Design a protein with these regions (language model features):
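Hydrophobic helical h-region of N-terminal Sec-dependent signal peptides
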Residues: 19-25
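Conserved functional acidic sites
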Residues: 49, 53-317
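Bacterial signal peptide processing site
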Residues: 33-36
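A generic signature of intrinsically disordered, low-complexity regions enriched in glycine/proline
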Residues: 7-10, 40, 74, 154
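Bacterial N-terminal signal peptides that target proteins for export
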Residues: 2-19
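Intrinsically disordered, low-complexity repeat/linker tracts enriched for polar/charged residues
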Residues: 11, 38-50, 54, 60
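C-terminal motif of bacterial Sec signal peptides marking the signal peptidase cleavage site
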Residues: 28-31
Length: 317
């Protein structure tokens, strides 16, 4: 998720996803109904929704192609406590839903884990997240995604290393990392998302056609997913130059993170996801995750020689 285009990293697969379990456990559930069904007051269904005049957007309406990045504005970059996108090491999100591939709607599952690894990218120490994407039970993508929070509370996306698979066979590793091949950092989530504000870049990786942007779609929404029911939900719409007219909707609960994914417009994947499990991993489980993430990084140094191999190694606690 993700973010990956969290949650989806290929032009045809945008995920995300987007997280703070310790805080989440202290948040009381809203007064919604059952957990397995959408709240009756929910105004944005998980399937297609209509664009409203308040939130109509397009790549042409943006004010700037990428964001101004100041690497000196990251004094505590690995402490990511953004209200809408907190990232605490050991937090694991599991999403389930479906997406359309080859004209068929297939089960889709995403496992997004915040590791306890950090990695310096473009002069900023980032938090390493490990993201796995399954279609019809088969792994189609595994990815390392790199995030950091600036002193103003914005969460930045500084790159990612994805490995793509088809029928169990490795296909490609279209990595983009800020500072290489003209790639630039983008903002995954602003500290204070504002309705009506111009869209912003979530990262710029021209070598692999990464041009994702985000904009506030709606605020103050309610939604129910298997994990819980949430109020005051922020809904963001994401789009890219490669998919004009296709929008992914991501639902963010305060203090939690991404809890739902939907779509609108001409999105060929029509991806829908709901948060079905949220856990804080044990020390042993987190160590296992760290080991697997480091295995993925080791492959990255071999498969992405011009990009990832030029970075310094990830570091553990």
């Amino acid at each position: 998720m993700w973010n990956s285009r969290h949650p989806r990293s290929r032009p045809s697969r945008r995920r995300g996803p987007f997280v703070l379990a310790a805080l989440l456990l202290a948040i009381p559930p809203s007064a919604c109904g059952g957990r397995d069904q959408q709240s009756q007051s929910q105004t944005l269904p998980e399937t297609q929704v209509e664009t409203t005049p308040q939130t109509t957007s397009s790549p042409e309406a943006t004010e700037q192609r990428w964001e101004v990045f100041d690497r000196n504005n990251f004094d505590q970059s690995t402490t990511i406590e953004n209200e809408w996108f907190p990232l605490q090491p050991g937090t694991q999100f599991i999403y389930e839903g479906s997406s359309v591939e080859g004209g068929k709607r297939l089960p889709h599952r995403v496992v997004f884990t915040v590791t306890d690894l950090t990695k310096v990218i473009d002069g900023v120490r980032t938090v390493v997240a490990w993201d796995r994407d399954y279609s019809a039970g088969e792994l189609v993508e595994t990815e390392l995604a790199l995030f950091a929070q600036d002193d103003d509370g914005n969460v930045w996306h500084l790159g990612q290393y994805p490995e793509e698979y088809e029928k169990g066979e490795f296909v490609d590793a279209p990595a983009w990392i800020a500072g290489f091949q003209n790639a630039r950092p983008g903002i995954s989530m602003k500290a204070k998302p504002e309705p009506g504000a111009p869209s912003y870049s979530q990262g710029w990786g021209p070598a692999v056609n990464w041009t994702d942007r985000a904009q506030v779609y709606r605020t103050g929404e309610e939604t129910c997913v298997p994990v819980d029911c949430y109020e005051d939900v922020l809904v963001m719409e994401e789009f890219s130059e490669e998919e004009p007219g296709a929008f992914q909707l991501k639902y963010y609960a305060p203090g939690v993170g991404n809890v739902r994914v939907g779509w609108k417009g001409d999105d060929p994947s029509r991806e829908t996801l709901k948060l079905v499990k949220l856990v804080q991993l044990s020390a042993e489980a987190l160590a296992d995750v760290r080991a697997e993430a480091l295995k993925l990084e080791k492959r990255a140094y071999t498969l992405s020689k011009d990009v990832y191999a030029q970075t310094s190694p990830a570091e553990g606690p």
